[in-house]
Amino acid sequence: MQTEAMYKGLTRPAMFFGVPIIPLFFVCAFFGLMSIYVDLKMFAFTVPSVLIMRAISKKDESIFRLLFLKMRFLSNPAAKKFYKVKTYNSQSYSKMPFNNDFPKISAIGLHKNPSFDKFIPYQTLIGNIVVTKDYELLATWQVEGVSFEVEDEIDIDQFKNRLNMLFRSVTDKPVSFYFHNCKVPSEDRLESNFKNEFLNDLDRKYYDGFSKENTKSNNLFLTMAYSPLGRLERSSFKKDSVEKRVKELNGYVKTMREYCDSISASLEAFKPSRLGIYKKDGVDFSSQLEFYNYLIGGEFKPVRASNAPLFEYLNGGLDTIMFSNSAMQLNFSDGKKRFAKAVEFKDYTQFTYSGILDALMYMDIDYTITQSFTPMAKVDARDGLVKQRKRLVSAEDEAISQIAELDEALDELANGSICFGKYHFSVVVYGDTLRDVEKKTNAMVSKLSDIGFLASISNIALPATYFAQFPANFAIRPRLHSISSKNYASLMAMHGFASGRKNKNCWGDAVTILKTPSGTPYYFNFHEIKTDDDFGKDDILANTLVVGQSGSGKTVLMNFLLDQLCKFQDRSTFLDSLPENKKKATYFYLDKDKGAMGNIIALGGKYISIDGGAPTGFNPFMVDTTPENLRKLKILIKMLVTKNGEILTTLEEKNLNAAIESVMFNFEKEERKFGISLVLEHLTEDSSETNSLRSRLELWQRGNKFGWVFDNETDELNFNDEDINVYGIDGTDLLADNEINGAVAHYILWRIFDLTDGRRFALFIDEAWDWIRNRVVADEIFNQEKTIRKKNGFIVLGTQSVEDFSEIPIAPAIIQQSAAVLILANPKGKKENYCGVLKLTQEEYEFAINTDPAAYRFLIKKANERAVASINLAHVGRTNLKILSTTKGYIESIEKINKDKNLNYEQRLHSLKKLYEAA
């Protein structure tokens, strides 16, 4: 990953005798003038003053600017009379109209408390542009950001270079940028209408884990401030007539909109959304004002768009803000209280790289990170660099390497690869109690130290640090330093966590909500996102591949996603215009080792367990006589007589097909008992030859070696149960028998895919490589993978072994036809399999081998996004968790429950829970 020098010579003042040159000059000049005009002895105070300044500077090189800001926030000492600490009211009581009917009594003296509205610079709202008191124009974008956790370093650097290009492009324009990363509590759940006790209980308990205490939301905002007027021009502008000011302001707004169009285009890769006016219940609200209001109080709340001066009603929902030396107490109008502390950079790292501050996003802390940057014109930047270099040299500063870095900075500036600007950084940390905020702030300082920054808690100019979060409060930004545009691009990075899409997906809402490592929600969907509203479209790809070793949580994940998918069986989730008889959903789960048996029973499904050697209840001749069924039946019977690689002659195939057609056309469905025996009766081929067609087919006749598989009286493989929408089929014994597994898999899949008639359809196949290793079966799956989306269905394939999966003839096609690939942990995964077969990048492969299987994290790889997520099942309860994955110790007992035909659903579920609870 590319790194860039921090040019630390610009982040600290030039020192002489251990004292910053500028305050040293003013002190010496002050006592020099005093000695001239008052008394020569006054100059003697210079030496002790310098020594004191030197001692102070050892603590903090920027202390004199902080002390200056502290003086700016000095207030009437009488204001502390009631609250005992510096307190700012949300409104100025001295401005309130005075009622002459009452005597002037000031028992509390609230009118002496300063109000913080003077630090709110916002004056007027013009659409999606805010105009400040000093006629600066502000526009704000919320950005999703770019994924970074498993991205290629080259791609990450390209995004950084785009930001660098953006900042370089505006050096000739009077604009500034504020970037905010706001981590706030978030509470969310998806509405589901399950007609099932188990699913309702599982869903409710699962979403209990998404309360505000457990879930966060990372919100990224970029604000551009356009300052068309300099200080002198501003003074003149205020004296102009209203007509002239309105005319000029309209011109500034027009220019601002042009700038905004350019910025929006530059931010396209970061998925920006411009904040502005929106309607709710016929009333205008402003998302831009909601963001500025958040910066005041730390909570997002709806804010109406009003014609009133913005600083008069933007108060963050606060009543007062109380400042001590290093902490704040935010007192809300509803009586709630929160505490906050601020953290600043005292010193920087030697180098920066894209996403250097990403580690902060993983902290379980509510915070607001503010980073402002005011680009300087190239000439001004060069003059500043030269001046700072001269100061360091003339002051005989010992930072020789920093002087050399400034020479490099001048070269890069001359080459046009970077620009420079004034930068400031702060993190405001929130907590519910003073102890809580102290603990979290210390953790924040520690994390920044681990990254390489020297961070400190703001305790000198805390009010300035807090109010400097507000875009356009340029004058009170503490610890203002010059850094390069590449440094700023790396520090802000605009890295975010993919969030999926909550609604307007192919089937409506997201399937479920997962959690990213930062605690933010990820709205999971099988279907791709094609348009802004995909609801009701039935040709969107959703095939999914799930890869994870044993113990990584693959079975639990697949079963949980199946359970959540069951909410789409409810008729209210379909398009209103769809006929009632089309509002259907049917799901299948092809199981291995009966790991899903308990879950299928619990969700009210039908679980078919097939034991090797026992009659399966399969009779493929019981299907309707349609051209497609006849084609598939011929394929199946041909598979039976060529299982060892035999090749049928043209005559043999003709005779076999004729026998099949004779049975299908000459017998009614109910008369086709023991279908293979009937075919043998109509087969004209002579059986005298060794390994003849007849002798090979006779192996599958009732009473012979494989007669139990297909030559049965009736066909019990039907899915026409009125109240059942989910079917599970265990193929453990059948798949273990290489002589029959291909034919059995073909028949089961044939009957399953018969239901892809436009209804919502999903087929989950665990250990898919075992089900589809036969070439004929693989070809059928290949065809379905390509066409099933047009029938409103999709296939979810799961596998433990990428190596085994790679041996499937259609493995490359499956990858190509998958809308999503879910990669779970596999410390033993081989690069040639993950990168060669699954086409993962090096970073994605490293995620698979370096992730702890016990963490149950997985990578979601889709065409338009990548996300690391997990299912947090800590709240679902021990019993529900066990149901999601049946372990071997329970299989025998659960099979007894499943085979007991006298039990209804409630009794089965009760027996199942009782079994797990007793363990």
What do these predicted ranges mean?
Residues N505-T531:
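N-terminal pre-Walker A segment at the start of P-loop NTPase domains
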Residues A658, S662-L735, E739-G758, A848-A919:
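Conserved P-loop NTPase motor module
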Residues M1-K8, I63-F98:
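Membrane-proximal soluble regions of multi-pass membrane proteins
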Residues H527-S552, V556-Q564, Q569-A596, G604-P615, ...:
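Conserved P-loop NTPase motor cores
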Residues S147, Y178-N193, D208-E213, F560, ...:
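Switch/coupling segment of Walker-type NTPase motor domains
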Residues M34-F43:
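Transmembrane helix interruption/hinge and helix-loop junction motifs
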